[in-house]
Amino acid sequence: MAKPPAVAAAAAAAASEELSQVPDEELLRWSKEELARRLRRAEGEKVGLMLEHGGLMRDVNRRLQQHLLEIRGLKDVNQRLQDDNQELRELCCFLDDDRQKGRKLAREWQRFGRHAAGAVWHEVARSQQKLRELEARQEALLRENLELKELVLLLDEERAALAAAGGAGGGGGGAGSRSSIDSQASLSGPLAGSAAGSGARDVGDGSSTSSAGSGGSPDHHHHVPAALLPPGPHKVPDGKAGATRRSLDDLSAPPHHRSIPNGLHDPSSTYIRPLETKVKLLDGDKLPPQQAGSGEFRTLRKGFSPYHSESQLASLPPSYQEVLQNGPACPVPELPSPPSTVYSSAGQKPEAVVHAMKVLEVHENLDRQLQDSCEEDLSEKEKAIVREMCNVVWRKLGDAASTKPSIRQHLSGNQFKGPL
């Protein structure tokens, strides 16, 4: 059984110590055999120790070799991990740069969204303001039109009253022969007697003139100025037939025309009729495009009484004469202003009516300019884009109002009128 290396080393050390500790006198007393035996034993122990030391060295070298291999493997692993770490670091830098770019782009989009929303909101507010201004202007125009209509009716009533007073003062001589004609004139107006008898004729300046014939004589004809008669041959009606025709014409006329005399030679009547026709045509222009044609035709027909429509047709353009006689085959074009020759002189026009005509012309010019400027501002495509953007904004506001009560309460104040 071999001794352990530590035990052998300890024994060799002990033997050497024993030999070194033995004094020289003791060594001299030993015999040669004893010295040789002790020497051989010490050499054997030394050889054993050297063998054990060599084994230990081989073991240590083997372990060192293993440790070196492990160190190399760990170095390789460490290098690989460092490479992976470097790649991950570069990837993190790339992702961080991408994140920074994404944040910057998001901020840009956010600023663009705020700017676009502000611009859309401003445009919507401006459009709503324009709509409110247009509505207010339309209401003002409607009120002015109503006032002008009332003014025209008041002027007609005043003229009828003045004509009635003049006719009552100048027609006392032929009362017996005008009994039937006066009963018919009560329906058509006091001045109707001037066409069938010797009644007074009011010229608008406060004076009255009478004709020479008797009230019921058939040789007395109604005098009409040549400028107001339609072109072509004219047939003069006799007394009874003319009176009957005028009575039937006045009965078929509109209610507010029955109180207006039919004296076409009167300057006020010559001026009031085209003015009333123009007011009705202005009202007809506000109808939708589908109803414009028939509405203008009805307005034209309504503006002329059956008795004096021929004289007023003569003052209209040929296209309107065909439409009034045959009916509207297509939408009627816009009626121009009545010619100045139809009106009486400026000195005979009432001041209020002249002012009303100036107001009408100013409003017509403003409406035409406003319509042209509105059409030139935006094209149809731009209008469609603005309407779509407004609808998107209102949908967003509706979604926000469904979640936030404050926005719902703010929108319930009717500040805006909803999507276009």
Curated annotation (Swiss-Prot):
GO terms for biological process: cell population proliferation; cerebral cortex development; establishment of cell polarity; establishment of protein localization; Notch signaling pathway; radial glial cell differentiation. The modification N-acetylalanine is found at residue 2. Residues 185-212 have a biased composition (Low complexity). It is found in: Cell junction, Tight junction; Cell junction, Adherens junction. Predominantly expressed on the surface of the lateral ventricular walls of the developing cerebral cortex. The modification Phosphoserine is found at residues 179, 247. It holds the Pfam family CCDC85. The keyword Ribosomal protein does not apply. The keyword Transcription regulation does not apply. Residues 165-271 are annotated as: Disordered. It comes from the Eukaryota. Its main location: other. Disruption phenotype: Disrupted in the hemorrhagic hydrocephalus (hhy) mutant. The mutant animals shown sucortical heterotopia and non-obstructive hydrocephalus with frequent brain hemorrhage. Signal peptide: none annotated. May interact with ARVCF, CTNND1, CTNND2 and PKP4. May play a role in cell-cell adhesion and epithelium development through its interaction with proteins of the beta-catenin family. May play an important role in cortical development, especially in the maintenance of radial glia. This is Coiled-coil domain-containing protein 85C.
